[in-house]
């Protein structure tokens, strides 16, 4: 418990907090309750944190580990930009093209048609700092990790060598827009999203999010794919079950 308290008082400051309030409540009542619960908390000095930047990767990182797990798993990752970079939206769309929904490329081709994977997913970290585009999956019975990796790489090479079609790109954009709209129906999601956008910039940015995704072009996706899906920018982990 002492370690928890020490961590809390070192890194958590209400000076940094963003309070988002939604629902049937007046401004006056919001102010009253905020002052009631937060005003008594004393302000403390905020230490300046100097976080080291990760060294640029210049060669592929690869590792194989064996553990007492029921199934083999393949993990691949590629360095990407921060959420504040203009290319962030292209990365998010690339991950959706790869594995968001039954008609996405990895799901349709490698899971449903070729049956090389029992499950396969692609997603981005979405952090304020530079992050990773992740690809993780569990190969089907009888499929080696080498075969699984080769199949994924073939799909990535297709993104690098060709342009995403207009219909496929529009489908992904429409899906994102509908998710945004329905995701902001309930009060909790609205408050969470407003707080996040205020923390990372300004709350009004939430109204520009759909436009930011809509502005991504096939040419931008092609450029980002070529820059990203390179061996020297990638990390590969074979997570194998032990032969007991």
Where are each of the predicted segments found?
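Charge-rich, well-structured scaffold segments of protease-associated domains
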Residues: 1-46, 64, 82, 90, ...
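His/Glu-based metal-binding/catalytic segments typifying zinc-dependent metallopeptidases
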Residues: 46-103
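M16/MPP (pitrilysin/insulinase) zinc-metallopeptidase core fold and M16-derived inactive scaffolds
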Residues: 100-116
């Amino acid at each position: 418990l002492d370690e928890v308290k020490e961590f809390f008082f070192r890194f958590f400051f209400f000076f940094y907090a963003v309070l988002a309030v939604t629902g049937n409540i007046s401004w006056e009542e919001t102010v009253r309750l905020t002052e009631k619960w937060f005003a008594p908390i004393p302000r403390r000095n905020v230490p300046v944190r100097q976080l080291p930047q990760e060294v640029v990767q210049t060669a592929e990182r690869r590792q194989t580990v064996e553990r007492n797990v029921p199934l083999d798993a393949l993990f691949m990752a590629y360095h990407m930009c921060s959420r504040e970079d203009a290319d962030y939206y292209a990365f998010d769309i690339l991950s959706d093209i790869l594995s968001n929904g039954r008609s996405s490329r990895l799901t349709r081709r490698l899971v449903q048609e070729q049956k090389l994977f029992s499950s396969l997913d692609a997603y981005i970290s979405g952090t304020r700092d530079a992050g990773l585009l992740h690809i993780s999956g569990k190969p089907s019975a009888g499929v080696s990790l080498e075969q699984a990796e080769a199949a994924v790489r073939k799909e990535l090479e297709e993104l690098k060598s060709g342009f995403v079609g207009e219909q496929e790109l529009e489908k992904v954009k429409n899906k994102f827009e509908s998710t945004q709209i329905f995701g902001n129906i309930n009060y909790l999601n609205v408050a969470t999203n407003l707080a996040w956008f205020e923390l990372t910039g300004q709350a009004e940015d939430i109204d520009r999010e759909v436009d930011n995704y809509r502005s991504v072009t096939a040419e931008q996706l092609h450029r980002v794919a070529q820059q990203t899906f390179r061996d020297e920018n990638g990390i590969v982990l074979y997570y194998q079950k032990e032969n007991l």
